[in-house]
Amino acid sequence: MAFGGGDYTLDLNYEWNADESVLAYARAKLSHAARLGNLEPPIDTVVLQIKDDERFLQSARHGKQFGFGGKLCIHPAQIPLTHQVFTPSDEEIAHARAVVAAFEAAEAEGSASIQLDGYFIDYPIVYKSQRILALADSLLS
């Protein structure tokens, strides 16, 4: 599933603003629909300003926050920017590994929640960490 922001804003006579706030509702609905349908995360809309890397990165981050798994690209220069946002960083991978390892150790002792580096960790956080590790494994191996 992919989101076409241009089609969406045309159909609803919206003005596609720089902060993309007019896209928030559709992004949320698509992300929910993909999840409810047990589909892969949807792919986010294009950015028309092909020479504006910062705008592209901001848009990609918004898409990622809404659960999108990637970004449609209309220019080759946008591909590495997409990877920059949607590929887990070394820090994210290290943190995810630490979360999973600490939780598995705690779970072996009968605990279903822990504190790690000042953060509460329970099953949803562990599952998210496992998802990050699986994504990193599939993209980086």
Identify the residue ranges that each predicted region occupies.
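Expand to "…catalyze enediolate/carbanion chemistry for C-C bond making/breaking, isomerization
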Residues: 1-141
